[in-house]
Amino acid sequence: MTVLRLLAAMLALILGMAATPAAAWGEFGHRTTASIALANVRPETRAAIQRLFPYAERLGTPECPLQSLEDAAVWPDCVRAQGSRWAYTAPWHYRTAPICEAFNPRANCASGNCVTAQIERAQRVLSDESLPGNVRLEALAFMVHFAGDVHMPLHSGDREDRGGNDREVTYGIVPDLNLHWAWDGPLAERAISSAQPALTRPYSAEERQALAGGGPDAWGRESWETARDFVYPEAFDRPPCEGELPKEATLTQEDIVRALPVAERRITQAGLRIAELLDAAFAPGKLAEPERR
């Protein structure tokens, strides 16, 4: 295959990816957060996770495998695409807030139908050993996936554009993406594949202290601030709240390079925090009650 044909094939692949529905971090990003988590949980947590996978058949989703934590990290996006059975879960993947208004941690979460509330709900279901294994396995998948979602800046920050879905961008030489998917897919994948050292590894206590901790509301605020202070200004080369933003933008190679450490940090934080959620869910005793919304 000539270099020109190879580049054309790669371009076709990326454009094909761009046509898929937005899902935070894309499959590769979500699987990476799960791999990071699995490398950093306690051994007894890892064993408890493995004991749930035999219940996957009872969920009745053969088209969406659920035999590993990496599968669990993408399972909610897979089932959401299967039709009406899982349509009610669509609002659980995000909680966007306008970046040009004061952040309100209680907004856009009616009846718990938002990503931050569903992380807490799923963790409590997962921790309840009196529940059937298939119910806990479903909760495991939702918790792991949504904890990844909340770390994606454009699942929390919004400029009247559905978290960047309505802003067309050219990503390097690749046209016709949207801002949301540029961050979900190619940017996240490049951040993961170029990271040195590799993101999937055991982290030291000092690294975990610097990168992990907090709870879903705080993680959502971090993502909102990242969207406000970096994603939108970097994409449009201007303060995002001074007048209307254009509907189109170009992410140059320089823009992409500046964004890589931001994406890398959010993916790493997601993985380490998923590990903390898992360790807490499988630890003896009851979880603390979440703050009431």
Indicate residue ranges for each PLM-predicted region.
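N-terminal, motif-rich segments that launch catalysis or mediate targeting to/interaction with membranes
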Residues: 23-146, 153-293
